[in-house]
């Protein structure tokens, strides 16, 4: 099993994916253990002094002016976890919770939180045991971080609340810890606050979204190329010299991908010297510009994610010179903004894919294809309602593109009077990515069927490889009407598991 070592200087996106999705084992580095102990020594020294220190000997949020006596401080830390574990709604996915916990452990190990080494080790032990706290959909405003979701995780650390075991059953967390030989932690000064004051949920979802969208943008380039081919479009617009004079990196990459997929096709318009069309519709001709802009959005979001993965987000933080200082680094705005940005880009990619699909089905714009790609139009409806489904998905994606980060709402008696809503931005982006996968799958279904209806013209070798593979995957080709939902589900799985990209790359080699 792969092992991820957590040190003091952050983690990588690959580390997050390995833990969240791959079940990688976690170890703490010796450097991290030393830093944890040193920071804890600073907190213990401050806790012994009469002066109040936020998070160590005071209340929280709007109650920060209350000085807490020594004998109540352990109760204070337990209470903040219990009271802040106030989430509601459906359970959050296992991979999201694992990413959330791992990223909190990353910050704890930075040596800036004052959490004891044994608490950090218990966090790692819970993840290694495959125990997943029950975290709910609603409860985070994205500032001070993802409070309620992280509190549910901290509750498990205390042996309280519910958690999911390795077998997928939900049981009392205390029972699961006992079965795996894990001793619940007794929280001390600052530890409760340090376990729940971070942007780890939204960051984990951002990292996973970037991985998913990387694959989807490649898939969308392939389906755009298939649609261009099916519509007898021209690939001249994909020429490298045209994209070099507007040098957006993503645009060039998408154009190169499409050109590679179309190499050797007999359907693209440049083979027809007397072709009356000199320009294709925008949804075909401008595919690299739209997908490329999305790719550049991914690059910006990835830069933000990398900075966050190298950050220590807590309030207050322990500094090497012995100070414990309040700060605003828990505000999720940097992450929230790019999550919203990605939702906008994803919605537009879905929109342009749907427009190409609609063009394939319209006999007045498809350049010789039968209405709705039907076998016997009138008797058969073909893919008419598949496009309805695609349109419904696009419509929802447009609603999901409305920025959550622009909708701050005050809380905590106006002490926390501006929040990021980054968790909400991340949740809606996950839905948008699911929708986009389905939209691309429907374009794939329509485009491969349309190419097969172009009898007498040989598609590009890469296109043929995709058609052959998707048929083997259970997606039926042209013919009389049949129950469509299973075909669409099979096409969705073909895109989702990477088979589409794999099939194309058997001919093209690695795509960008």
From Swiss-Prot:
The UniProt record lists the keyword RNA-binding: no
Modified residue annotations for 2,3-didehydroalanine (Ser): 144
Post-translational modification: Contains an active site 4-methylidene-imidazol-5-one (MIO), which is formed autocatalytically by cyclization and dehydration of residues Cys-Ser-Gly.
Swiss-Prot/TrEMBL keywords: Cytoplasm, Histidine metabolism, Lyase
Keyword Transport: no
Xref: CDD domains: PAL-HAL
Enzyme class: lyase
Cellular localisation: Cytoplasm
Entry EC number(s): 4.3.1.3
MF term (GO), any: histidine ammonia-lyase activity
Pathway annotation from the record: Amino-acid degradation; L-histidine degradation into L-glutamate; N-formimidoyl-L-glutamate from L-histidine: step 1/3
Annotated transmembrane regions: none
Catalytic activity: L-histidine = trans-urocanate + NH4(+)
Pfam families from the UniProt entry: Lyase_aromatic (PF00221)
Main location: cytoplasm
Stored InterPro entries: Aromatic_Lyase, Fumarase/histidase_N, HutH, L-Aspartase-like, Phe/His_NH3-lyase_AS
Any single Gene Ontology cellular-component annotation: cytoplasm
Covalent link 5-imidazolinone (Cys-Gly), residues: 143-145
BP GO terms, sorted: L-histidine catabolic process to glutamate and formamide; L-histidine catabolic process to glutamate and formate
Family: Belongs to the PAL/histidase family.
HAMAP family referenced in this protein's UniProt entry, alphabetically: His_ammonia_lyase
Name of the protein in question: Histidine ammonia-lyase
Organism the protein comes from: Streptomyces avermitilis (strain ATCC 31267 / DSM 46492 / JCM 5070 / NBRC 14893 / NCIMB 12804 / NRRL 8165 / MA-4680)
Gene that encodes it: hutH
